[in-house]
Amino acid sequence: MDPGQQPPPQPAPQGQGQPPSQPPQGQGPPSGPGQPAPAATQAAPQAPPAGHQIVHVRGDSETDLEALFNAVMNPKTANVPQTVPMRLRKLPDSFFKPPEPKSHSRQASTDAGTAGALTPQHVRAHSSPASLQLGAVSPGTLTPTGVVSGPAATPTAQHLRQSSFEIPDDVPLPAGWEMAKTSSGQRYFLNHIDQTTTWQDPRKAMLSQMNVTAPTSPPVQQNMMNSASGPLPDGWEQAMTQDGEIYYINHKNKTTSWLDPRLDPRFAMNQRISQSAPVKQPPPLAPQSPQGGVMGGSNSNQQQQMRLQQLQMEKERLRLKQQELLRQAMRNINPSTANSPKCQELALRSQLPTLEQDGGTQNPVSSPGMSQELRTMTTNSSDPFLNSGTYHSRDESTDSGLSMSSYSVPRTPDDFLNSVDEMDTGDTINQSTLPSQQNRFPDYLEAIPGTNVDLGTLEGDGMNIEGEELMPSLQEALSSDILNDMESVLAATKLDKESFLTWL
């Protein structure tokens, strides 16, 4: 008989009230009533009697080795002994017959859930994978007639999802059970109550029973658990599958999810904010429907959004009002005193905060020294050199060597910077000589590194500039206010093409 096809041995008798002993070397633990028996290994050959010697006679070793190599190199011509077909082996009928679907019910069982100790029993771990389908047989066993038997038969025909992983050892066993291992490291379990051993983990049966009893819990208790965890977010709905598993539907995105949306940290934060708001709470004993809780959560979110919009609108109104006040202050300046240093300093100081706060996107305040045409262009557009027929701006350049800006204007208007000529030095300039110096370029701009102003573009028809006037006036003393203002201008990071200074 083939050693791999021996029937399982009969379990050894055990005394009442004593735990089963450790299985012997080379054999599995004994099997109790209704439990599968582990496969036994072939018995070791008996030793010869005393005084007898066993003599092995072998032929030519080289011939035997050549035969082995020929069998591998030339498998077609080699004399390979044929194996015994599966049909000729002494296998039970259930090995060739797959189980029928009706055999899972209790009504199809003929032995009322018990099996004899000598009946060959097939467990999924020790049976052919081709004859048994995964998940087709629940923790029962097969008899030669293909009927499910075993103590694990349940009164219902419901098929549960089986776990495909081993339960860790730290999970406690039921009362009266003990886990042990064979010499080969395979685990088995001892039942001290029935004085039996088995390969099946009793914790799996406990988990399956818990899964069976979980859907049968009263709906009132389930509703209490759901209400205790809080209402669902707006647009979410809780549903249940046919197997009793809970899932969640998002009506906004038309999606479903197994994860509870109330566990999302974003929803928890919004719920905390809504709870901290001074909202009138209902009486503690009054029942609250889940729909009312959802509406309350949505109303709190809407109130927060409305409050945020109101704050943004109020901020925008304050910014527009500040700009309007600055424009009115610039319009009310007398044109006769527009060229005074105080007025120029006021215009420069009022222009910088607006550009820094608005990120350089708002219209700069027009300088009082500008002409009427430039003042109108500055008020109506974001760039004083756009939307004009006389001034043209260069395209955006990213390879410019200047570090202050990527935009430049090829030509500066003649009367654009003529109003700041009094701010260059501390020298006293006679007011009567001011009209004759309207076209004079300010000296303090030449002293700033990085400006590189092309003075040739500022020459007019009646402009006569001497050579000494083109030299930078570093030797002249500059006032501290002018230096502070220009440092703030150069340090600004957001003064691009809307800047009141033009970088060439």
UniProtKB/Swiss-Prot annotation:
The modification N6-lactoyllysine is found at K90. The modification Phosphothreonine is found at T63, T110, T119, T154, T412. Increased expression seen in some liver and prostate cancers. Isoforms lacking the transactivation domain found in striatal neurons of patients with Huntington disease (at protein level). Its main location: cytoplasm. CDD domains: WW. GO terms for cellular component: bicellular tight junction; cell junction; cell-cell junction; cytoplasm; cytosol; female germ cell nucleus; mitochondrion; nucleoplasm. Changing P129D: No effect on phosphorylation but loss of interaction with YWHAB. This is Transcriptional coactivator YAP1.
